[in-house]
Swiss-Prot record:
Pathway: Amino-acid biosynthesis; L-histidine biosynthesis; L-histidine from 5-phospho-alpha-D-ribose 1-diphosphate: step 1/9. This is ATP phosphoribosyltransferase regulatory subunit. It is found in: Cytoplasm. Belongs to the class-II aminoacyl-tRNA synthetase family. HisZ subfamily. Heteromultimer composed of HisG and HisZ subunits. Keywords: Amino-acid biosynthesis, Cytoplasm, Histidine biosynthesis. One of its GO terms (biological process) is L-histidine biosynthetic process. It comes from Caldanaerobacter subterraneus subsp. tengcongensis (strain DSM 15242 / JCM 11007 / NBRC 100824 / MB4) (Thermoanaerobacter tengcongensis).
Length: 379
């Protein structure tokens, strides 16, 4: 038997057509918002990613000159490099992409190691309307596929960041706390508080964070706690929410103030998309105002990435995986009518049909039921 490595998959014709259809819908929506598509290389020097990703999470290899290369684990970092080193012009700059990403993930928890992301980056503006735009765009993109019952959970990196700065924790403890909050593991968080002897105000906030998810009332709930570090954050989230309300997006929005992102380059608003019946995020995004500075240009930015495969799975589970397929037409012809048959086939193709041509003799083994129409030329 010949097997594939863990975390990769083949896409057979119908499955791949379904996938491409979703990707094309995303491209159409991105383009309608003024975003231009870009395609970075599949691999780069490993050091281009080393400040963002652990070596063990990347697929790294040597070239013949001894350079250490890596398959891209993230497209946002690549776009930050491109904008910082190759793109000059007026801002804001709107870029989008559909590209495969490679990460050495734990496949036991349902993650792939090669997967496709469709995303956008809005660079050069730090206004709340920019954050609202990319969140609204993520919603419009997901809606374009026919997906139902999804929500965008919104949080802010500074809720967690302000706590960590006050606690003066080491990197290992910060990562542990991040993981506990991600899991909303209240008992383990309580043990962490006691073990680290965290002072009363921060301890109270840590206990609250796993519970701070829901509608706009969550913002009011945290405001009443009077944590100084979160005052500006809550005001900002409230302004973004009001913009999204004006956009007619209220039904798709909820808040999760205990949200933390695995990628450490987020500096402001963060968000994730979830769909009913699927335990994984189908979309992740947020503001990353310090990332471009690493590559030499100090510009604010915000964006998101949608997992195409997870959207496929969600659509299949919702039985929304069908799309309007083009009509399939069979053109049968006599050999002496080949020229006329080809001209007829091209007319049908220009009308949006998928057309196959066979002589009458070759049609003996063709499944005529697989075609929506059969056109005979010369019979």
């Amino acid at each position: 038997m010949i097997y594939l490595p863990d975390g990769v998959q083949d896409f057979l014709p119908e499955e791949y057509e379904f996938k491409r259809n979703i990707e094309d819908k995303f491209r159409e929506v991105f383009k309608s918002f003024g975003y231009k598509e870009i395609m970075p290389p599949t691999f780069e020097y490993s050091e281009n990613f080393s400040h963002l990703f652990d070596e063990n999470s990347m697929y790294r290899f040597f070239d013949k000159k001894g350079n250490i290369l890596a398959l891209r684990p993230d497209v946002t970092a690549q776009i930050a490099r491109i904008v910082s080193t190759k793109l000059e012009g007026r801002y804001p700059l709107k870029l989008c992409y559909v590209a495969n990403v490679y990460r050495y993930e734990d496949t036991q928890v349902g993650k792939m190691r090669e997967f496709t992301q469709a995303g956008v980056e809005l660079i050069g503006t730090n206004h709340e309307e920019s954050d609202a735009e990319v969140i609204a765009l993520s919603i419009e993109a997901l809606k374009s596929t026919g997906l139902k019952d999804f929500k965008i959970d919104i949080g802010h990196a500074e809720v967690f960041g302000s706590i960590v700065r006050n606690l003066n924790l080491g990197n290992e403890d910060v990562n542990l706390l991040r993981e506990l909050l991600e899991q909303k593991n209240q008992s383990a968080i309580e043990d962490f508080i006691k073990q680290k002897e965290i002072k009363r105000e921060e301890a109270k906030l840590l206990r609250e964070l796993p519970l701070l998810f829901g509608g706009e009332e969550i913002l009011e709930k945290l405001k009443k706690e009077n944590f100084k570090e979160t005052e500006g954050v809550l005001e900002y989230l409230d302004r973004v929410y009001k913009i999204l309300e004006d956009f007619g997006m209220k039904e798709y929005i909820s808040f999760d103030l205990g949200m933390v992102q695995n990628l450490n380059y987020y500096t402001g608003i963060i968000f994730r998309g979830f769909v009913k019946g699927l335990g994984y995020a189908i979309c992740t995004g947020g503001r990353y105002d310090k990332l471009l500075k690493i590559y030499g240009k100090d510009l604010p930015a915000t964006g998101f990435a949608i997992s195409v495969e997870r959207v496929m799975l969600a659509l299949q589970r919702q039985s929304k995986g069908e799309w309007v397929k083009p009509r399939r037409v069979l053109v049968r012809y006599k050999e002496e009518e080949r020229r006329r048959a080809y001209e007829k086939a091209n007319v049908l193709r220009k009308e949006g049909n998928v057309v196959e041509m066979y002589t009458f003799k070759r049609c003996e083994n063709i499944d005529l039921k697989s075609f929506d129409e059969v056109v005979d030329v010369g019979e």
